[in-house]
Amino acid sequence: SGNVQKKIVSDWLKNKDGKDTIADKTDLKNVENVKGDETYTEGNQGNIEWKANGSDIYYQGTTDKELPVNVKVTYYLDGKEMSPEDMAGKSGQVKIRFEYENTAKHTVKINGKDTEMYTPFTMLTGMILPADKFTDVEVSDGSGKIVSDGNNEMILGVSFSGLKEDLENAKGKDKVNIDISDSFEITANVNDFSLAMTLTVGTSDVFSGIDVDSLDSIDDVEDTIDELVDA
């Protein structure tokens, strides 16, 4: 259903100079080293120091802070919204809708004016649907792709959360004619519904080099969107 049960954050401290210790600042709880036996000592105000011994440090911990993008998943059977638990074992036409809400809002100056902008995220959602249960599988136009190996339908959906709002805020709604979706849908006919794991990954790196305040960048955005959807 997309309800959050636990938030785990992973950090990678690169030790390119081979230092004996690495200082970091974190507000994570239950911090643990996930790729070595290096230890750390805690200081004040979230400061920690890792005994790196020349190595990179990979650690993770939990947080109760808001995620930069919230994911809502809604399930329908024959047009009626239903929980996946209630859908288990049933047959009919199924629709699964993923919605992405960007919460990473901040204020920046554009042409001397304070403007609310988002950190744009590329959201990739993937799942595998067994071909003996799911037929006539379709995905949202322009925002997904289906790959079949005969036994399974492999689904990949792409969404660009916060990007359209940034472009509209930077250039004006009348100058942005790109169809950028913040949702993704799958429809299919199903026999004996069951669903294995779905995976959603978000990254802000894809558009990190694009200046939304440049008209030329809009062409770059269109090209990048097309490349990701067609990949």
Positions of PLM-derived features:
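Cytosol-facing boundaries of transmembrane alpha helices in integral membrane proteins
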Residues: 1-231
